[in-house]
UniProtKB/Swiss-Prot annotation:
Membrane topology summary: Multi-pass membrane protein
Organism, scientific name: Rattus norvegicus
InterPro entries assigned to the protein according to its UniProt record, in alphabetical order: Cyt_P450 (IPR001128), Cyt_P450_CS (IPR017972), Cyt_P450_E_grp-I (IPR002401), Cyt_P450_E_grp-I_CYP2J-like (IPR008071), Cyt_P450_sf (IPR036396), Cytochrome_P450_fam2 (IPR050182)
Catalysis: reaction(s): an organic molecule + reduced [NADPH--hemoprotein reductase] + O2 = an alcohol + oxidized [NADPH--hemoprotein reductase] + H2O + H(+); (5Z,8Z,11Z,14Z)-eicosatetraenoate + reduced [NADPH--hemoprotein reductase] + O2 = 19-hydroxy-(5Z,8Z,11Z,14Z)-eicosatetraenoate + oxidized [NADPH--hemoprotein reductase] + H2O + H(+); all-trans-retinal + reduced [NADPH--hemoprotein reductase] + O2 = all-trans-retinoate + oxidized [NADPH--hemoprotein reductase] + H2O + 2 H(+); 9-cis-retinal + reduced [NADPH--hemoprotein reductase] + O2 = 9-cis-retinoate + oxidized [NADPH--hemoprotein reductase] + H2O + 2 H(+)
UniProt binding sites for heme: C447
Protein name: Cytochrome P450 2J4
Amino acid sequence: MLATAGSLIATIWAALHLRTLLVAALTFLLLADYFKTRRPKNYPPGPWGLPFVGNIFQLDFGQPHLSIQPFVKKYGNIFSLNLGDITSVVITGLPLIKETFTHIEQNILNRPLSVMQERITNKNGLIFSSGQTWKEQRRFALMTLRNFGLGKKSLEQRMQEEAHYLVEAIREEKGKPFNPHFSINNAVSNIICSVTFGERFEYHDSRFQEMLRLLDEVMYLETTMISQLYNIFPWIMKYIPGSHQTVFRNWEKLKLFVSSMIDDHRKDWNPEEPRDFIDAFLKEMSKYPEKTTSFNEENLICSTLDLFFAGTETTSTTLRWALLYMALYPEVQEKVQAEIDRVIGQKRAASLADRESMPYTNAVIHEVQRMGNIIPLNVPREVAMDTTLNGFHLPKGTMVLTNLTALHRDPKEWATPDVFNPEHFLENGQFKKRESFLPFSMGKRACLGEQLARSELFIFFTSLMQKFTFKPPTNEKLSLKFRNGLTLSPVTHRICAVPRE
C-alpha cells in the first residue's frame, strides 16, 4: 500500500516537474520573442501580431498585396508588420517612395533574406546578395550585358528572329484554343539564354521545358503558407513534407542544369574570345585564383540563375497579361493593329526604331504593366544602419516593402485607376511618361534588365499583334484573376490566336 502511494506521489511529482519545465520554457520563448520583436521608440505604427508568427495570419497569402491595403487606411503611408521574426515596414505614396529611394537609399541597399532564400542562395548572385558581392556582381552583369548586345542592333535582331519563331509556334495552333504560357516563356527565355549560355533552345526541347516548369513551380511555391512557416520554424519544418521541400529539390535541379552548361563551356573555353556571360565570368574567375573576390563557382551558378529567372519570368508574365487584356478589350486591340498596319505593315518585322512612331502601342504596353502589377510590393530592401524616414525610426535589419499596388492604383495619380485605360499614358496623341509608374523600381537596385525588358515587350507584343487577333475561346470565359507567387501571373487559361492574313 505504501509502495503504491509512493509510486503515485512520484508520478504526480514528475508530472508537475515536467509541467513546470514546459511552462518555464514557454515563458522563456515568449519573453525572447517579445524582446526580439518589440517596437523601439518612434517606430512606425502597425497591427499587433501573435507570438512567434507576428502578423502572418492577418495576411491572405493568395493576395498579400491586397490584404495590406486596409492597414494603409488605418495607419497611414508608413506602417509596420512582423512577418515571423522579420520586422518590416511598408511605404505607400509617390512622395514617400521618392524620399526613400533618393534621400535614404544609401542606407537601404541591402537585400533581406528569408531562411529559405538564404539556404537556396547562400547570399550569392545578383538578386539576393548585398554589400561588396552585390556591387561586384551587378557591375559585372551590366558590363557583360552591354558587351553581348544590350542596346545594340545584334540583340535586336535576335529578338526579331525569336519573335518569328514564336509566331510560327503559335500559328501551328491554327486558331484553336491553347495555353500560351510555356511557348511565350520559351521565346522570352531564349533572349537571355543567348546572352548567358550562348544558345537558344527549341520549343520542344524536353530538358529545357522541364527547367522552365521547375522555375515556374519555384516561383509559386516559395510564397505559400507552408513555405512561410518554414521561414519561421525551420528546425521543425525541415522534417515535415510540403511545398518548401519541393522548392529545395527544384532549385537543386536548376543548379545542376546550370552546372552542366558551365562544364560544357569549360571544354572549349577560350579566354581571349568569350562567347557569353558564362565565358566572361570564367575569365574573371581566372584573374583571381585566390578567391579574393566574389567571382567564384557558387556566384557563377547563382548569378546565371538570377539572369535566367529575371530575364524569363517578368517579361513572359507581362506578355501573357498583354494577350489576355487584348482578348478582353477588342477595341484596344483593333487600335493597336491599326497603328501597326499604318507604321509597319505586314511585310517587315517590327523594330525598336518604330516605337517612337507608335505611341498608342507603347501606351498599351505600359498600361498592361500598370494593371498587371506583377511585382506588387517591389523586391524588398533591408535597412543597413539605423535610419530615420518620414520622422520614424527604422532600426538596422528592418525590411522595407514598397506598396507599388497602391501607387499604380492611386486615384491621385490615375484618372481611372481600376480600369484598363491606355489613355493614362497619352497626351494629345503622344506617349507620356508617368512619374508614378515604377514597374522596374527605382534607385541603385532598380531592375538591371529594364532596357532589355522594354525592348522585348515591344518587339514580341508588336510581332504578335501584327500576325494574330487574340480572342476568348468559344464558351470559355477569360478572367483577370491572378496566381500569387514571386510575381503575379494570370491563372491558367486558354486563348485563341486567329491569323490576320
